Amino acid sequence: MTTDEVKALIVHAIPDAVVTVRDTTGSGDHFSAEVASAQFAGKTLIAQHLLVMDAVKEAMAGSHAPLHAFDVRTKAI
């Protein structure tokens, strides 16, 4: 999986998101994302993270999932 593919999953689910994704190991399966969105306003940090995790959950499903580890940081804009 590429950083662009991870970003596309997030932007598809949260269209106004400003997203930065890093491949943390260079292996294409461990990523870190910073996501800012107006949709996060008034939501708890956990609720914000759940919105992002929902966007990538299919890529993390199963033992051979292309996305193995995912670290997320969020903020409202």
Task: Write out the residue ranges for each language-model feature.
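Charged, low-complexity, helix/coiled-coil-prone segments
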Residues: M1-T3, G28-H30, A69
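N-proximal, solvent-exposed amphipathic alpha-helical segments enriched in charged/polar residues
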Residues: M1-V18
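Short hydrophobic/aromatic beta-strand micro-patches
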Residues: E34-A36
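Short edge beta-strands and adjacent turn/loop segments
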Residues: D16-S32
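A generic short-segment signal for beta-strand/edge and adjacent turn/coil regions
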Residues: M1-E5, A38-K43
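C-terminal structural segments of small proteins and small subunits
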Residues: A41, I46-I77
